[in-house]
Amino acid sequence: MNDPNWERSVLERVALAAVTEQRRARRWQIFFRFVWLSLIAVLVFSSLFGTKPEHLASSINGHTALIRLEGAISSENQTADYLIEGLDSAYQDSNTKGIIIQANSPGGSPVLSGRVFDEIRRQRQKHPEIPVHVVVEEVCASGCYYIASAADKIFVDKASIIGSIGVLSDGFGFTEAMAKLGVERRLQTAGNNKALGDPFSPSKESDQQWRQQLLNGIHNQFIQAVKQGRGQRLRNDPDLFSGLVWLGEQSIPLGLADGYGSVQSVARDVIKAEEVVDFSPRGDLADRFAKRFGVEFSSGVHSYLNQLFSPQLR
């Protein structure tokens, strides 16, 4: 304390520290404002332009509308909604001469598959002048084929995988594992069959028979839809509805497909409108953001329960 100016020195250091802290806080404030403004700008831009398909920039000449069917057919993927939305957009465009559904899916929900099947049939009846064809890429099996059978024609590559007209419901039983671990299952129900399919309770023959009856019912709906869509083109083969899959080159003589073709060749040679315009809805950034942090949060548990209890066309 020999320095007579020590008080002034301390005050200067305190003031300097305060100014430094204020500058640091201001920089962070500016940073977060920039982040929020950028996010808002992206969301607004995406909402205005993100969902608009390529047809808005297409020429006035006639074109072939393309709609993509990719991945598992499920509510999480919004497969049915996107397909139906794409169909509506394609039909509403006065320049659409024909529609191609580019299929690459292993199947999925029988409910959603049937919903899209019915919508394609409805739109075909409403717009008979606009054909709807399916072009199979790698695979179009089970629920995907359910949908494809509603089209005017199905085109494949010789190495495509097609078919699997069947229904599957799988799961696991944990009763023996629970017994070894000393875990006791305590389950109360109101209704004698409320616990049907419970993986933690012993499986009963009556439960299996009931589940098989449900699967047979869905399978029969699938078969009738394929027969309705394909008609006399189907070959009378006992294995046709057994759940087997075939190569593209095998599917044509069986009547499951009509010929070979790609998106480009079908647009050019069948629809006669070589320009292909993608009408596949993508969803804007806001939709994807909400889906990622909303629906996807519970999709793991939901998918697991579906595997245990819900039949799948695959």
Give residue spans per PLM region.
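Extracytoplasmic ligand-binding site segments that recognize negatively charged/polar headgroups
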Residues: 164
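N-terminal organellar transit peptides
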Residues: 1-157, 168-314
